[in-house]
């Protein structure tokens, strides 16, 4: 088959990734072996920025005032494509979300693209985004201006299957405290106001509400403080919650119903309640169909079979990449790291992320992303189609919250 400029570019990008395979796999394994929680990823930050700087990219460490974020840029003119890296881990189970794979695949794509950027007439920005697991690192970078002028943003995420997208829903966390009045639980129970009762009644109200919420909506919580001794009426109780809905607009409606459940519990127990909504809001994901179809073709050219997620087998999650998708056309495809049925956020997945399956995903992910960067650089109409599609999608989703406002 004759080589077109685009196919020739992809062949050369693949060679760039292969030539760096030892470095990329070493980075993935080292990050996997030294898991760091959100905003504490100093080892990963220094490792990734060191490799990027050694390769000649213009590196900004601690970008936008975020200590463990970074930006690395190459190229002069042409479409600016951001390749996103994540590298925070989970408490107790390490890289059970496979962020070591995300970091190394993004690194590989960025290095390969940077090597050809000047020649192919494009720009690449490798963005290191800390604290995806609840800390909203990307939101801080959005607010700081990282994605201004970016034409598209790309990343891959490990999973137990190759998929064009994950079902990303909007999310906000809440911390709730209840204040009552302590009393001896046997001698003077009538003098007490039981804060734990208020928390439990609120929890049960939310449990009843779950029967009557929309598909894709989720309410999950824990009681973090319910008193000190059973013979003392608890004067203080505390709960933590996560509220999810398919869109930011739907999230606001669900939050109102959720709040009513908790307030009713506090009223019934005669206690005071204070609810703190934790920023940032994680937005739902607007997947660029124009771009993800190119990613799919590129990944399948590497031998992977990439499916469109089935509505009957929804895997619901949340990510601050959703916020990025409200400010620039974005994709968040899933790349297989584990066998079917091994979910993320489990110890079993941690093992696969650091094993041969994770290594294969690093190299395939780097190539598929780099190929997609080339599509955006060399297909003159792709950026325009993606941006037109994106503007229409954003306009159709009212109540969007992209940054931290």
PLM region spans:
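Histidine/acidic-residue-rich, glycine-tolerant segments that coordinate divalent metal ions
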Residues: 68-71, 88-96, 100-101, 106-107, ...
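Acidic-glycine-rich active-site phosphate/pyrophosphate-binding loop
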Residues: 74-86, 165-178, 338-348
């Amino acid at each position: 088959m004759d080589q077109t400029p685009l196919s020739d570019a992809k062949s050369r990008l693949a060679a760039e990734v292969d030539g760096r395979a030892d470095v990329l796999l070493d980075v993935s394994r080292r990050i996997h072996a030294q898991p760091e929680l959100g905003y504490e990823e100093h080892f990963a930050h220094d490792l990734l920025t060191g490799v990027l700087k050694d390769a000649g990219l213009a590196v900004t460490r601690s970008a936008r005032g975020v200590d463990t974020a970074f930006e690395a840029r190459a190229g002069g003119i042409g479409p600016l494509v951001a390749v996103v890296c994540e590298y925070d881990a989970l408490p107790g189970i390490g890289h059970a979300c496979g962020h070591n794979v995300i970091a190394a695949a993004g690194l590989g794509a960025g290095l390969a693209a940077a090597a050809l950027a000047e020649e192919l007439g494009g720009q690449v920005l490798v963005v290191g985004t800390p604290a995806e697991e609840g800390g909203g690192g990307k939101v801080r970078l959005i607010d700081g201006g990282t994605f201004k002028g970016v034409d598209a943003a790309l990343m891959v995420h490990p999973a137990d299957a190759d998929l064009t997208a994950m079902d990303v829903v909007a999310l906000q966390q809440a911390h709730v405290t209840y204040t009552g009045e302590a009393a001896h639980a046997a001698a003077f129970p009538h003098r007490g106001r039981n804060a734990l009762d208020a928390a439990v009644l609120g929890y049960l109200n939310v449990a009843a509400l779950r029967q009557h919420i929309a598909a894709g909506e989720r309410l999950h919580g824990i009681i973090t403080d319910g008193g000190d001794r059973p013979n003392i009426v608890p004067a203080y109780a505390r709960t933590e919650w996560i509220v999810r809905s398919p869109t930011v607009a739907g999230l606001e409606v669900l939050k109102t119903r959720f709040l009513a459940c908790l307030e009713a519990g506090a009223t019934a127990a005669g206690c005071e309640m204070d609810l703190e909504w934790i920023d940032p809001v994680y937005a739902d994901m607007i997947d660029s169909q124009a771009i993800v179809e190119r990613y799919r073709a590129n990944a399948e050219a590497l031998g992977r079979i990439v499916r469109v997620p089935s509505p009957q087998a929804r895997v619901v999650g949340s990510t601050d990449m959703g916020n990025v998708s409200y400010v620039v056309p974005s994709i968040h495809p899933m790349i297989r790291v584990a066998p079917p049925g091994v979910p993320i956020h489990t110890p079993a997945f941690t093992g696969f992320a650091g094993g041969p399956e994770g290594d294969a995903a690093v190299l395939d992910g780097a190539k598929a992303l780099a190929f997609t960067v080339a599509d955006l650089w060399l297909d003159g109409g792709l950026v325009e189609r993606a941006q037109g599609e994106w503007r229409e999608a954003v306009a159709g989703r009212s109540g969007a919250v992209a940054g931290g406002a």
